[in-house]
């Protein structure tokens, strides 16, 4: 791999770095050389991760060599000193020194080189983001350096009993109990297996690697990862492992002389605040009391619960009685706090939290004893629940333990002064639950058998909120971290970020993007195709006209945008509201006919499945791409890669401001106003509020344009983006390409967007994926004529349908056109062809583009009278090659200038109804389907509704790929669901695989009776 000298350090980089990459690596090395902190912004697609890894690991290697050389020099000096001493002492007095020198010399090897060499801690928001980074490291010249990821028991545990439990907290406490009682064989094998070849040979191990290796050697991956920390050059972990004091302690993280890299650092402010905050409810305290009481009853009445090493208690009934007394007093104290319900609660200084707990005799002096008692009780509950079906699960105790660890994270007057400055205590009425059931925490700790106490009228919620992210960052600096580097594609503006973090920043960088104007099209879309203003403000988002216009805007963009389209909403409620409204009005179905729609789910498993299905649609050579509707700050907007055809455009439907009336938001704005001075450059509350929305937008935009050859469109569909403040808070590289016309109509935007993609497809390199999605075009076929004598008179329903077609820009493909001949080899997925080549894939030929009758233009066409076309075909239109500011191409031939429509008497086939044709009464056993497959498809296409025909094609394609006969039959029975279509159903035997023919015949006999 090529080597480059950057700031005196040799860096191996896979290719000649761009200037932005050189600048970035130079700043990283500058931070490490001078032991300073840095804030570095480089847009997504500029190779930020690769540059970060190569520069930091190169510096660590350089430092290792430097330390090793210094050690050898020192050993040489010591040997010379020893020889002098031996001569003075008669030759034998230095035996002890010789032994010491031998040890020093042995330590001068690879292991000795680690002495004094900083370790890198690479933190990001999620494990999936870290897995991508580790994969990138494996592809560099530094893949020989040791890297390991830290994960939770939920991800790493392979114990058959523990791993089946729901929730990380349950697994954690059950694991601790088994380890303590030495009943986990996987844990017992960690020490003996950590030097096994299977472990040593895996230099870089992510979650999947750890589980795979741990399963192979039958050693616990969770504890194995902790053993590998010492020898690792770089550690990977989520933010909370690093920022949360309790997590740092649990993972034995040593921060001193460590290089801390915080990637995706636009989240760091929020993570710092949240990791230092807590919330506890009266219900949680009541659960604690119930749990303690239940255990006391067990112990007091000597209930026959067998006790072994695993379930042995580390507390007495007197300990429980004392704890219960404290909890009862805490409950009484919280319940007695006066709260103004009309004002949404009361706010107190941060130190008020100590007053609350001190009234229950929980204070700095005895906190550690109480914390240990809580941990012992939680572990005990976990073990007896597993063994004896005990109904308590300790959810409230877990919440209390975590709350105390945050409240008493420090001690002394200085700590209390920081609490008073950075924290607020907010107390509000606890809402009455509408339904009876289980109290489930975010981590799933409280289980299904948990008994839930009723919420009292005077129940409260006590929130202990940190509003200064610098509080957490200073804890890292206070532990003597060598350097802290914050980096992301969306950090700007840097000044307010640096001010809030409250740590010294010596190195700053705002990199430009490496793409040019031909690769990005940025538009502010202030109104929809119906000229309705697009504004997702709180006061307008219930406006049916706005919701409808937004839907039609997305619908209009879909045919123009190739591949994947990402649509981001400000919140889940607004996404759900739009989805429901569009489904009711039919807009959702119209979008789906152009591109299938996927919606971001909240559950982890459903999310992974949805993403997989989305990528499959994008990769489908016969598909039209897909639409993914998601939420700003959601999973899709953070860290996922939608390069190339996976994301050719992103639509931002609004500004994702935090909820204005939320107590935490109100207090954050108030806090900033209180601490803001001219000297500290801290932003105002209103500026912070606006910046929160802008950063979420910038992050969502960053999902597209992921590398130097990528291209895409950014469509800001909210007229508030015209405001100067909102524009100025967009990433600088986006502002550079932003149009300045505030009153640009919808039509010209469509035209410019269409030309942008046509031009990009011509001049920019196309990815491998895009070849699978390129639209196949054939020679244009003549328009189907229809002669209408006199005026065309249509009834109200027909007029409404035509108006709907015109307004919503729907084109239905020519149902009468099938080209070429069919070969079974062509039915299989084949490499795609360029637009100029003859199509080779049978199904893609069925969707080839032809000239169209433009039903959006209600003028009429003049056509030859000799046509034998039996139907009025409404075709997919062919993309215009000229410059066009309209959605639809202009008439391409001179003969079409004078237009009229004439009607030929013809049997009408309803393209949209599933009702039976009255002309057909049932299954005709003598009726035969065409032998030729192409002719058969022609007949099918004209015999069933369009929606069923498209589903039919999808069924055949899937069957050819997965050979799932049951799914094939299910799809065919839906397509041919009437007796008069059974002859077509029987004809489908020619598409069935040989080993499925007998099953097909049996099914046909069952359905058709013959």
From Swiss-Prot:
Where does this one sit in the cell?
Nucleus
Molecular function (GO) terms for this protein are: 4 iron, 4 sulfur cluster binding; ATP binding; ATP hydrolysis activity; DNA binding; DNA helicase activity; DNA polymerase binding; metal ion binding
Query: Where does this protein hold ATP?
Result: 42-49
Any Pfam family = DEAD_2
Region Disordered: start-end pairs = 912-931
UniProt superkingdom: Eukaryota
Q: Transmembrane region positions?
A: none
Spell out the reaction equation it catalyses.
ATP + H2O = ADP + phosphate + H(+)
Q: What does this protein do?
A: A probable ATP-dependent DNA helicase implicated in DNA repair and the maintenance of genomic stability. Acts as an anti-recombinase to counteract toxic recombination and limit crossover during meiosis. Regulates meiotic recombination and crossover homeostasis by physically dissociating strand invasion events and thereby promotes noncrossover repair by meiotic synthesis dependent strand annealing (SDSA) as well as disassembly of D loop recombination intermediates.
Q: What protein name does the entry list?
A: Regulator of telomere elongation helicase 1 homolog
């Amino acid at each position: 791999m090529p080597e480059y000298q950057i700031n005196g350090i040799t860096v191996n980089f896979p290719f000649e770095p761009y200037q932005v990459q050189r600048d970035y690596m130079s700043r990283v090395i500058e931070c490490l050389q001078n032991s300073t902190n840095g804030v570095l912004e480089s847009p997504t697609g500029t190779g930020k991760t690769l540059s970060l890894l190569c520069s930091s690991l190169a510096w660590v290697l350089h430092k290792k060599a430097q330390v090793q050389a210094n050690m050898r020099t020192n050993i040489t000096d010591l040997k010379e000193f020893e020889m002098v001493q031996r001569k003075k002492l008669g030759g034998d007095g230095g035996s002890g020194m010789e032994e010491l020198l031998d040890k020093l010399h042995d330590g001068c090897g690879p292991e000795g080189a680690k002495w004094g060499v900083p370790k890198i801690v690479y933190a990001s928001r999620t494990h999936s983001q870290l897995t991508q980074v580790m994969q990138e490291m494996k592809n560099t010249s530094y893949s020989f350096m040791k890297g390991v990821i830290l994960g939770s028991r939920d991800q790493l545990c392979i114990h058959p009993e523990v791993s089946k439990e729901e929730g990380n907290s349950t697994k954690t406490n059950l694991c601790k109990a088994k380890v303590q009682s030495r009943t986990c064989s996987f844990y017992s094998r960690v020490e003996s297996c950590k030097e096994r070849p299977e472990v040593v040979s895996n230099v870089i191990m992510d979650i999947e690697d750890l589980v795979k290796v741990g399963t192979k050697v039958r050693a616990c991956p969770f504890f194995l990862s902790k053993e590998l920390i010492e020898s690792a050059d770089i550690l990977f972990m989520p933010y909370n492992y690093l920022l949360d004091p309790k997590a740092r302690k649990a993972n034995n993280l040593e921060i001193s002389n460590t290089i801390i890299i915080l990637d995706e650092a636009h989240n760091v402010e929020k993570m710092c605040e949240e990791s230092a905050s807590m919330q506890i409810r009266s219900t949680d305290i009541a659960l604690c009391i119930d749990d303690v009481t239940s255990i006391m009853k067990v112990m007091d009445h000597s209930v026959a619960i067998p006790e072994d090493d695993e379930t042995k208690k580390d507390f007495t009934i007197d300990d429980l009685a004392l704890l219960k007394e404290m909890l009862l007093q805490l409950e009484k104290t919280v319940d007695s706090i006066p709260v103004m319900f009309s004002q949404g609660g009361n706010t107190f200084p941060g130190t008020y939290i100590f007053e609350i707990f001190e009234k229950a005799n929980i204070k700095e002096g005895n906190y550690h004893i109480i914390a240990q008692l809580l941990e012992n009780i939680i572990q005990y509950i976990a073990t007896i629940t597993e063994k004896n079906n005990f109904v308590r699960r300790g959810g409230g105790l877990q919440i209390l333990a975590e709350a105390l660890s945050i409240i008493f994270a420090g001690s002394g007057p200085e700590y209390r002064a920081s609490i008073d400055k950075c924290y607020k205590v907010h107390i509000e009425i606890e809402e009455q639950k509408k339904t009876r059931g289980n109290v489930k925490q975010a981590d799933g700790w409280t289980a299904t058998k948990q008994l839930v106490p009723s919420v009292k009228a005077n129940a409260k919620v006590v929130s202990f909120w940190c509003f200064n992210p610098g509080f957490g960052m200073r804890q890292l600096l206070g532990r003597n971290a060598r350097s802290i580097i914050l980096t992301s594609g969306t950090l700007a503006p840097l000044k307010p970020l640096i001010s809030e973090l409250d740590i010294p920043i010596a190195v700053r960088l705002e990199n430009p993007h490496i793409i040019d104007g031909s690769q990005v099209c940025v538009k502010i879309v202030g109104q929809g195709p119906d000229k309705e203003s697009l504004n997702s403000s709180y006061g307008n988002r219930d406006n049916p006209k706005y919701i409808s216009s937004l839907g039609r805007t997305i619908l209009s963009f879909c045919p123009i945008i190739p591949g994947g389209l990402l649509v981001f909403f400000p919140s889940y409620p607004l996404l759900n509201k739009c989805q429901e409204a569009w489904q009711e009005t039919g807009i959702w179905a119209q979008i789906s006919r152009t591109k299938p729609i996927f919606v971001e789910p909240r559950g982890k498993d459903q999310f992974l499945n949805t993403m997989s299905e989305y990528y499959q649609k994008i990769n489908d050579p016969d598909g039209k791409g897909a639409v993914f509707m998601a939420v700003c700050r959601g999973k899709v907007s953070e860290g996922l890669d939608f390069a190339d055809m996976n994301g050719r455009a992103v639509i931002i439907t609004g500004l994702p401001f935090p909820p204005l009336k939320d107590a935490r938001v109100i207090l954050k704005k108030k806090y900033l106003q209180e601490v803001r001075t001219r000297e500290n450059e801290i932003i105002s509350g209103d500026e912070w509020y606006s910046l929160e929305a802008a950063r979420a937008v910038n992050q969502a935009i960053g999902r597209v344009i992921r590398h130097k050859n990528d291209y895409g469109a950014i469509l800001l569909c909210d007229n508030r983006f015209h405001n100067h403040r909102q524009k100025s808070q967009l990433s600088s590289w986006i502002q550079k390409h932003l149009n300045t016309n505030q009153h640009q109509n919808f039509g010209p935007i469509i035209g410019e967007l269409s030309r942008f993609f046509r031009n990009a497809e011509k001049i920019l390199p196309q990815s491998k994926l895009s070849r699978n999605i390129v639209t196949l075009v054939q020679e244009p076929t003549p328009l189907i004529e229809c002669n209408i004598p006199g005026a065309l008179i249509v009834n109200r329903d027909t007029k409404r349908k035509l108006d709907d077609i015109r307004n919503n820009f729907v084109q239905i493909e020519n149902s009468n056109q099938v080209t070429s001949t069919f070969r079974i080899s062509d039915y299989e997925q084949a490499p795609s062809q360029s637009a100029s080549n003859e199509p080779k894939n049978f199904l893609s030929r069925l969707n080839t583009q032809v000239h169209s009758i433009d039903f959006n233009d209600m003028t009429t066409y003049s056509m030859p009278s000799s046509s034998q076309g039996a139907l009025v075909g409404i075709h997919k239109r062919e993309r215009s090659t000229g410059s066009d500011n309209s959605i639809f191409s202009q008439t391409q031939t001179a003969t079409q200038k004078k237009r009229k429509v004439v009607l030929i008497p013809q049997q009408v086939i309803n393209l949209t109804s599933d009702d039976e044709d009255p002309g057909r009464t049932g299954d005709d056993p003598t009726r035969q389907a065409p032998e030729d497959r192409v002719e058969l498809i022609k007949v099918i296409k004209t015999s069933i509704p369009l929606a069923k025909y498209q589903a039919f094609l999808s069924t055949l394609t899937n069957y050819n790929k997965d050979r799932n006969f049951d799914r094939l039959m299910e799809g065919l029975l839906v397509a041919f669901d009437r007796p008069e279509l059974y002859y077509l159903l029987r004809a489908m035997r020619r598409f069935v695989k040989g080993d499925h023919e007998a099953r097909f015949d049996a099914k046909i006999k069952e359905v058709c009776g013959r």
